[in-house]
Every structure is written in C-alpha cells, then in structure tokens.
C-alpha cells in the first residue's frame, strides 16, 4: 500500500510539474489589450471593431507614418461606423524601452510634419498638422490632428492621432472623417487616447 501511495504521489507531482510548464507559455504570450468599439469618440451611428490582427495594416500601416511602425511584434484593430467615420489602433512591443522611446519620437515627428509633407507630395492639396498637447498617462500620450482640403475635388478630411507609451509598449490611434477640425471631437479623442494607454497592461 505504501508503495502504491508513493507511486500515486510521484505521478501527481509530475502532473503538477507538467501543468506548470504548460501554463508558462500562456503567461509569456500575454498581449496588450485594445480599445473596444464603445471606447472610440461618440458618433451619430454606432462603432464596430474588427478582431485584433497580427502585424500592421496594408500600405505601411499608419496614415502620416507609413512603414514607421514595425510589423514584427505589432497587432492592430480597425474601427468604422455606418457613415464615413473610421479609425485604427496599432500597438507594438519594442525590444527595449529605449527602442520604444525612439519609436514614439519617430511617430511624433512624422505626425507633426505630415501636413507639410503631403502638400509637397500632392500639389494643390491644403494640409495642416497641429499639436494638441500631452496627456498624463503612464509614460505619456501625445495628440495631433491633420486637416486636409482638396480644392480640385472639393472634399475636406480631418484626422486625429495619438501616440502613447507604457514601458516597452507603444500604441498609435487614429480617428478620421470628412469635415474640418472644428467638426472633430478633440476632447473625446483625448479620453480615447488615455484609455488606449491605460488598457495596454
């Protein structure tokens, strides 16, 4: 009987060890959390959100910062309403915190200079980038806008952006629709940007 109990105890211990090993990869695979559709700025029609995809969106991933966010260790979710309002969140985990700081700087410079660059690339287009301040959350989040008008086809578009960081994790959020800056929900977007960083971990 003692031998049987010893054997059962050994088997149970081995099973617990295997369970611990099996749990380890799950813990290591923890990923940053994304915004939900309801956490985007309020719109006249409900927001919907895609599932979270691996990598970055097509065509370089981010308006005003194409190919700036590496596809490796990145994931994204897209948002849309029944009208023309849309958005995206791209989150990447950098190798080191120093790399994350560099990425934030790169994205901020790209957003700040986006209007001038678009005007150079598209003669006749009027584009203005503006900075809307820093949000106090984790290591910070910074908000920008891009207001564009194309007289040739008579349309105007407004986009809001945020770049936030929590340790090695950087998250980029964009909101956009037809219209001008006066039509944009800047205050509500700041809340969205803060939530995006708070939800990461």
PLM segments and residue spans:
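Short, well-ordered beta-strand elements
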Residues: 87-92, 168-177
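A short acidic-to-branched-hydrophobic micro-motif
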Residues: 76-108
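Short, surface-exposed beta-strand/loop micro-motifs that present aromatic residues
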Residues: 75-80, 158-165
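Short, surface-exposed coil-to-beta transition loops
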Residues: 86-88, 153-160
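Secretory targeting and sorting signals
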Residues: 1-28
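Short Gly/Thr-rich strand-loop-strand
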Residues: 46-60, 109-156, 199
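Surface-exposed amphipathic alpha-helical segments
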Residues: 176-201
């Amino acid at each position: 009987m003692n031998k049987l109990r010893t054997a059962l105890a050994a088997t149970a211990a081995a099973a617990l060890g295997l369970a611990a090993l099996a749990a380890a990869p799950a813990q290591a695979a923890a990923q940053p959390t994304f915004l939900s559709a309801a956490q985007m700025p309020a719109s006249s029609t409900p927001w919907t959100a895609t599932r979270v995809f691996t990598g970055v969106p097509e065509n370089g991933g981010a308006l005003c910062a194409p190919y700036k966010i590496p596809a490796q260790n990145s994931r994204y979710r897209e948002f849309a309403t029944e009208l023309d309002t849309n958005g995206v969140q791209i989150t990447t985990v950098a190798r080191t915190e120093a790399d994350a700081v560099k990425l934030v700087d790169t994205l901020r410079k790209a957003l700040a200079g986006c209007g001038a660059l678009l005007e150079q690339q598209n003669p006749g287009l009027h584009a203005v980038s503006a900075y809307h301040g820093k949000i106090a959350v984790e290591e910070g989040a910074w908000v920008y806008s891009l207001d564009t008008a194309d007289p040739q086809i008579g349309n105007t578009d407004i986009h809001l952006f945020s770049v936030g960081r929590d340790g090695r994790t950087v998250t980029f959020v964009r909101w956009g629709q037809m219209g001008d800056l006066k039509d944009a929900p800047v205050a509500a977007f700041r809340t969205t940007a803060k939530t995006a960083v708070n939800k990461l971990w």
